[in-house]
Amino acid sequence: MQARSAKAGLSRALGHEEPARTGSANHSTLGINLTGELYAKLSGKRCRPFNSDFKVRIDLKSQTRFYYPDAMVSCDQIEGDSTYLDNPIVVAEILSPSTRRVDLGEKFEAYLSLPSLRAILLIEPDFPHVILHRGNSSGEFTIEVFKSLETEIPLPEIDVSLPMTRLYERITPTKS
């Protein structure tokens, strides 16, 4: 029971506190769908997906922070005993009431400081809605929004396209 109550509190990393995850069934299912789709589409390729158990390290001017995105992709060689990434090319956050403020604020701003990052996916778990922030070589980001289950999210940065139908498979809508 002690481990469970510890998870309900805050996870700490180098003086930085991040709210513990308390995701819904939709959040969990969407996370599995996303990482499963990335894994299947990247199989045999240079880039490698990671789930929410793996953290990203972000060196800011004043401090180093660690975050646990819901999914991320790196195209660099990663040692098997590594405990974090410095250089994801894609990061995905599945939004939830308990983490939305941090995901869209502090974490989003920190992700933007990663020189390697080319795409940030912000995903609603309860209805089809994905916001893609795509970066270019000059560090500017553009926004694309996907709401139709009939569309695919193109990620040429990793040579993958994510079908919305696969991401939202087995999701029970709670909002419209």
Identify the meaning behind each predicted range.
Residues 1-176:
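Gly/Pro/Ser/Thr-rich low-complexity, intrinsically disordered segments predominantly at protein N-termini
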